[in-house]
């Protein structure tokens, strides 16, 4: 995988943390970058600036301290509102603006945003033209292969994007109707890669170093967008980068290393969100980290009732201490990839 450029920025590698609402907040972005991601993208920010006064929106728009280049995803269906939102985020420190035309969630699509936009190619063009003209930073785009299997217009949208001045394109290998079911279709991504000259990033079902290599070979993509597989496993970027570079698989992480990363992540969440919201946000992340370990279900039932930061950290330490002593986890005390 050769070096990838997005406008003036050369990425450390072509492995990108996909934007995920409720997941890719600043603590998670910073952690994934530390653990090997070449670029990390913010949670989706609505283009409706009248909603920016909520605490959730304000937290999503904190870019100071983010690893550079700072990529911020915006979502909406009105060209002028998206252009204004892009301009405002650049003023707040965004160095790359990413437009969401890939989210399949009903609450997004029902507002004629996300992958719903793929139904209207003229509107797609108007949005891309408006946002590119509004800012002097690179604009990127995330799409799906189409609205449904009968309307797979990803190739057409990719060409529209290139002509509009989009500087990189991420393609999830499913239609909006597919949601996350079935297998990702990499042949369509390969066709898109052949049809445009801008960088193309493949997305969908990339959950191991071996799968990463397969997808790169199958699509010819310039890089990979990794989302759900990084939840509870932010070191997947390091694993994939090492495998692609050397052909060798890194040893599974020691439990002690998983504990260290998780506690660091917890502390960052508690600081970023404050004690009350931080405790709530931490619960899902802890569930993801521990999902494959024995006793995790019982632990989560107890952990999710905890109400303060110190108790959360103490319980995580206790969980790992018990696993460390347990023969169930094996002599090496490693976490399977």
Language-model region placement:
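Hydrophobic faces of well-ordered beta-strands that scaffold small-molecule active sites
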Residues: 15-19, 40-42, 70-74, 97, ...
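Non-cysteine beta-strand/loop elements that form the S-adenosyl-L-methionine
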Residues: 42, 96-104, 163-173, 226-229
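Active-site beta-loop-alpha junctions enriched in small/polar residues
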Residues: 20, 45-47, 75-77, 102-104, ...
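Active-site beta->alpha loop and helix N-cap motifs at the rims of alpha/beta catalytic domains
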Residues: 69-139, 144-152, 161-162
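Glycine-rich, positively charged N-terminal anion/phosphate-binding segment
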Residues: 2-5, 20-95
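Glycine-rich tight-turn/loop motif centered on a GG-T
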Residues: 106-123, 174-186, 248-251
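Alpha/beta catalytic cores of nucleotide-metabolism and tRNA/nucleoside-modifying enzymes
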Residues: 1-3, 7, 11, 15-16, ...
